[in-house]
């Protein structure tokens, strides 16, 4: 697996409308010899043959490809966050017994959140790939729905466990349920909300890599393809990129959280 793959090569004969005078930035054309095993039809034995081919070499081409795939994985994560936000808000209010409008809404919200948490993202992604095909749509829905279930549970439990005295004081002066929630509950649970959200965002980035293995887009799909073709240098490049991306994201989240809390 070492050294990691950095450059990217492509046979000139397979590139349509290639202008040798206007090559991509930092690219060049060189001649390479490739040894291939072919069967001799006369002896019916495998023999090594050497072929000379012209290839277009992009010195950092594969690094750029991995970067684009990581951006796609980031978009999966952001799309899942948007889906999660739309799903979790009504459940966050209706799931706690203290803020639920009635018993039926409370039971329905609890059941829905439990249903979303019960199925792992990988299994959900497999079914969504069958429904929507290969691509990021299946990944966004799988990550978003599963994360909505977890955050719905965490948020609701924090609301239920919040100190009742500020809420009782607001209700005593005639505040409604929404104002009581906004002024009496949210300030108490906001630090926990930030911590839970940061954790789920970090987890979604790692899970976006995993669900890409089943065709749901992102860097995981590229990782599986290179692994299946035994291109372990490319696999090492992808693993390094994932580590760097997660490390940088973790540092940014730590700084943001320190400023907000």
UniProtKB/Swiss-Prot annotation:
Q: How does it sit in the membrane?
A: Multi-pass membrane protein
Extract the CDD domains matched here. Answer: TM_PBP2
The record places domain ABC transmembrane type-1 at: 47-253
A Gene Ontology biological process term: transmembrane transport
Tell me which Pfam families the record gives: BPD_transp_1
Residues spanning the membrane = 122-142, 203-220, 229-249
Instruction: From the record, give the cysteines joined by S-S bonds.
Output: none
UniProt xrefs under InterPro entries: MetI-like (IPR000515), MetI-like_sf (IPR035906)
Cellular compartments annotated: Cell inner membrane
Q: Which UniProt keywords apply?
A: Cell inner membrane, Cell membrane, Membrane, Transmembrane, Transmembrane helix, Transport
Domain of life according to the entry:
Bacteria
One GO cellular component term noted in the UniProt record for this chain: plasma membrane
Tell me which PANTHER family the record gives: ABC TRANSPORT SYSTEM PERMEASE PROTEIN P69, PHOSPHONATES TRANSPORT SYSTEM PERMEASE PROTEIN
* Function text: Probably forms part of a binding-protein-dependent hypophosphite transporter.
The name of this protein is: Putative phosphite transport system permease protein HtxE
Q: Which organism is it from?
A: Stutzerimonas stutzeri (Pseudomonas stutzeri)
User: What is the name of the gene encoding this protein?
Assistant: htxE
């Amino acid at each position: 697996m070492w050294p990691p793959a950095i450059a990217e090569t492509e046979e000139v004969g397979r590139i349509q409308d290639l202008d040798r005078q206007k090559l991509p930035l930092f690219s060049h054309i060189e001649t390479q010899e490739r040894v291939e095993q072919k069967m001799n039809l006369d002896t019916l034995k495998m023999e090594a043959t050497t072929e000379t081919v012209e290839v277009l070499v992009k010195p950092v081409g594969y690094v750029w490809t991995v970067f684009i795939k990581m951006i796609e994985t980031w978009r999966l994560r952001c799309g899942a966050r948007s889906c999660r936000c739309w799903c979790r808000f009504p459940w966050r209010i209706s799931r706690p017994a203290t803020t639920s409008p009635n018993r039926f809404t409370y039971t329905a919200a609890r059941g829905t959140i439990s249903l979303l948490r019960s199925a792992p993202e990988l299994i959900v992604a497999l079914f969504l790939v069958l429904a929507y095909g290969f691509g990021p749509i299946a990944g966004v829905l799988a990550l978003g729905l599963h994360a909505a279930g977890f955050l719905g549970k965490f948020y609701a439990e924090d609301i239920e466990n919040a100190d009742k005295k500020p809420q009782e004081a607001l209700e005593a002066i005639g505040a409604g349920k929404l104002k009581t929630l906004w002024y009496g509950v949210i300030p108490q649970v906001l630090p926990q909300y930030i911590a839970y959200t940061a954790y789920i965002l970090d987890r979604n980035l790692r899970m976006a890599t995993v669900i890409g293995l089943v065709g749901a887009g992102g860097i995981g799909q590229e990782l599986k393809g290179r692994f299946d073709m035994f291109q372990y240098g490319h696999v090492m490049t992808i693993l390094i990129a994932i580590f760097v991306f997660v490390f940088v994201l973790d540092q940014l989240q730590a700084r943001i959280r320190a400023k907000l809390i």
